[in-house]
From Swiss-Prot:
The gene is DMRT3. SUPFAM superfamilies: Cysteine-rich DNA binding domain, (DM domain), UBA-like. SMART domains: DM. GO terms for cellular component: chromatin; nucleus. DMA domain interacts with ubiquitin. Keywords: Developmental protein, Differentiation, DNA-binding, Metal-binding, Nucleus, Sexual differentiation, Transcription, Transcription regulation, Zinc. The keyword ATP-binding does not apply. This is Doublesex- and mab-3-related transcription factor 3. Residues 155-179 have a biased composition (Basic and acidic residues).
Amino acid sequence: MNGYGSPYLYMGGPVSQPPRAPLQRTPKCARCRNHGVLSWLKGHKRYCRFKDCTCEKCILIIERQRVMAAQVALRRQQANESLESLIPDSLRALPGPPPPGDAVAAPQPPPASQPSQPQPPRPAAELAAAAALRWTAEPQPGALQAQLAKPDLTEERLGDGKSADNTEVFSDKDTDQRSSPDVAKSKGCFTPESPEIVSVEEGGYAVQKNGGNPESRPDSPKCHAEQNHLLIEGPSGTVSLPFSLKANRPPLEVLKKIFPNQKPTVLELILKGCGGDLVSAVEVLLSSRSSVTGAERTSAEPESLALPSNGHIFEHTLSSYPISSSKWSVGSAFRVPDTLRFSADSSNVVPSPLAGPLQPPFPQPPRYPLMLRNTLARSQSSPFLPNDVTLWNTMTLQQQYQLRSQYVSPFPSNSTSVFRSSPVLPARATEDPRISIPDDGCPFVSKQSIYTEDDYDERSDSSDSRTLNTSS
């Protein structure tokens, strides 16, 4: 047993021993080696007998350790700056741990009266936690990371910046030993992508669910009422698309999910009319919804017959009449709006027929669709304006339009005098309004013909020859 204790060995001269295989080198204390003593570094720094030595060799070791600590701090700062340069400006505003530059300046310097004593080495678990916090605070380039702002880990990170300048390491190999478990464990401590943030791509839309984004909280003004729906904004309306829709579903099923209020047969006809294109079918349905919405706004007014600027009662488009979606829709094609039903009794002449609603004295069952057109203003090839009937190319409305010649006029011979005698309407030549609503109280009358029987016998069935004979 020597004078320095059992762990210490003197470096003697070469001993004649057989050569051994080179073993893995274990770190030794540099101060003890300067004084001719070998001591293992593990658990030795606090109890080293030469820790306060001020000889030339020990001072050289102290200076070398300070240079290495400054290099480590500089490398950390450069690494953080390079990572911050990759982060876009929109993500820098998010709350997160303070940068390492502020962390070093935050702790108070120790008072000068107390001698600077070396701090004990930090456990590897704390180093790994601090490294994991640093990697979590910097978002990865491929995905967004959830921000962790735990106070205990932040304090450990603050202490890490402080120990980089104040802790004295007693060997050049000691720094490698301390940094090696930090790097080895930080590689295994990468925080995986937070399960709260999910990137859902449905039809080319990237959507972020709740959590991780402060704008998606319920108290945010931008938060929608339906968090699990995707809002598709089109030129004529907005529709909410559920996240549960998959790309491999048939287009008809997708339309049923988006428009649950429409009948499946109507959706199928619209889809066939669009050639199976789902986007075009959605646009058609959205445009029809916008026209119905405009009609619902008008239905809030008193249900009376409004006149256009030119004073003609039958020159309206469909949206100018006070009708609601329940009175005029694809599902109710055989229903007549209540505001356009006239009484069969022509003796009840209101003094101002345009001021009050034109309602019959008793309810009448609906029979035929209303044909809103002016026979003199529109040709036979285009009897409707483009926005009169949105879903005109469906087979149901086409068949009803082919049956328009079977309708009869609901007006008796003297009922049009109510409108012609009104001072609001200008005097016009008598024309066939082509509104056919048969009543229970009046008998069926034959269709009023424009030509007499003698003229009709002389003319052919061709519409071209009729036009020529009329012009002559």
